[in-house]
């Protein structure tokens, strides 16, 4: 397995999706993140992959996009009640039709948005655009379908999509990176 290739692919897709989100005013050129939210992907990923892999052939955009919705949900949970969020099992994000309407369930029941609201429509549009771009970037690599490398490229793409979703929600909630200037003597503070 060419780990260097996978790392470069992940960086390329992340940069491209961040560019799209920034151009559309959904992010400000920075991928907002918290370690808690980022690391929670490792908990959700095995179940997500089990669902998404079966969707790739018929619904490639959905198989990537729903990871973004999971990112939205986890970032929202981090802001509102992290202890409850980390106990939320993957399938609790399912809609009435399971994986198929997970997006609508998360928007309506986790984020608390009306499906026909401007915010919900803006999120749907940016996640769809990012997922379509991710699928295009995967296809451009011309990797043999259903090969181990195809699986690993897909896994990297959905991990990035999850982080994009989380960043979108953190921005929507009002979080932003700000430079903090520490006083010059900060490093010489006495130990407690």
Predicted segments with their positions:
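Intrinsic-disorder/low-complexity detector
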Residues: 1-192
